[in-house]
């Protein structure tokens, strides 16, 4: 197994601060995926549960059976853990592939990073949509931008790119984006923008509530008729980008979400775009979490594909977490 296991101090931190959640389904720690053994830190015993879709849909801290230590975090478990341990912003940055110099607010760090796009996955998608034969985009329009994961990925892929505007409705995310990218115009709520700037590349991690397993049935019903992606296509019609990259939860490709996926792909084709899509796992790009997301890429001037993830050494939480005494908030914050 690649990656460094957690040391005793780090394990103690996780055990101590997960005890309060030990009886909750959300805190069950899965040790062996094949046998679906679950470790409960409250009782320190192994419990074997039938591993079905309902259990796999829960937010869990995944363990590697060989190393016996945590190898990945999902965003919900990350938020639970942060309530007790107060992770440093540096640790969050490492988990999602952000630079450690990224400036963050003093509050809502877990929430902002939990909802952020994994930068290495976004980078792979941005490079894929242009391919080896496409002209590098000079301008970016960043929709449903969060704290700027797609912006970072686009800058890594195309160093000369300039972002002409971003959209998000969460005040903390907008503030964080502006702190890190002060020259980019904030366009406000995507549903209320009247005039869109032209751009070569458009990215959007549009809301996933209607398709997410973590979303409750009532919430799905509320979102059923909203068709939020139609607002993204309003921007596409106005900006007319040559390249588009969309990100969402992998459930969009499951039977319940497939009608929406088909509608999105057909909307691209009706506009003359060539499309492709692939589910990517953040762990395959060296991040210490299993985070599956679907990336939809579209291109006007040629065919497009998203290659499989490159071979990469797996990273464990032991590689990125600091000991409790070192995990102080000395990070760049506002």
State each model region's role:
Residues 116, 195-199, 286-290:
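Short, solvent-exposed polar/charged micro-motifs at secondary-structure junctions
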Residues 1-164, 169, 174-178, 267-271, ...:
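S-adenosyl-L-methionine-dependent DNA methyltransferase catalytic core
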Residues 55-58, 187-190, 279-282:
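Short alpha-helical segments and helix-capping/turn motifs at coil-helix boundaries
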Residues 99, 118-119, 206-207, 241, ...:
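Proline-centered helix-kink/hinge sites
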Residues 1, 168, 227-299:
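Conserved Class I SAM-dependent methyltransferase catalytic core
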Residues 78, 100, 191, 282-285:
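Residues that form or immediately flank small-molecule/cofactor binding pockets and catalytic motifs
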């Amino acid at each position: 197994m690649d990656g460094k296991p957690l040391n005793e101090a780090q394990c103690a931190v996780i055990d101590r601060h997960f005890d309060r959640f030990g009886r909750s389904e959300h805190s069950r720690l899965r040790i062996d995926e094949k046998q679906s053994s679950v470790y409960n830190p409250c009782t320190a015993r192994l419990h074997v549960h039938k591993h079905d879709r309902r259990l796999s849909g829960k937010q869990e801290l995944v363990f590697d059976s060989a190393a016996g230590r945590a190898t990945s975090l999902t965003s919900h478990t990350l938020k639970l853990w942060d309530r007790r341990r107060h992770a440093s912003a540096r640790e969050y940055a490492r988990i999602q592939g952000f630079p450690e110099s990224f400036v963050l607010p003093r509050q809502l760090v877990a929430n902002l990073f939990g909802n952020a796009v994994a930068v290495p996955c976004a980078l792979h998608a941005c490079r894929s949509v242009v391919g080896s034969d496409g002209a590098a985009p000079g301008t970016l329009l960043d929709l449903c931008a969060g704290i700027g994961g797609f912006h970072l990925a686009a800058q890594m892929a195309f160093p000369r790119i300039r972002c002409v505007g971003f959209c998000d409705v969460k005040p903390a995310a907008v503030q964080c984006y502006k702190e890190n990218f002060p020259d980019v115009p904030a366009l406000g709520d995507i549903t209320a923008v009247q005039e869109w700037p032209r751009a070569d590349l458009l990215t959007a991690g549009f809301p996933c509530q209607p398709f997410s397993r973590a979303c409750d049935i009532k919430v799905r019903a509320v979102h059923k008729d909203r068709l939020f992606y139609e607002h993204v296509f309003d921007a596409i019609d106005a900006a007319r980008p040559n390249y588009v990259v969309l990100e969402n939860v992998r459930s969009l490709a499951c039977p319940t979400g497939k009608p929406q996926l088909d509608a999105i792909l057909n909307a691209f084709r009706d506009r003359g775009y060539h499309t492709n899509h692939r589910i990517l796992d953040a762990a395959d790009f060296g991040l210490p979490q299993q985070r599956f997301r679907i990336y939809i890429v579209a291109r006007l001037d040629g065919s497009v594909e998203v290659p499989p993830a490159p071979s990469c050494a797996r990273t464990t939480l032991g590689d990125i977490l600091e000991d409790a005494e070192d995990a102080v908030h000395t990070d760049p914050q506002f």
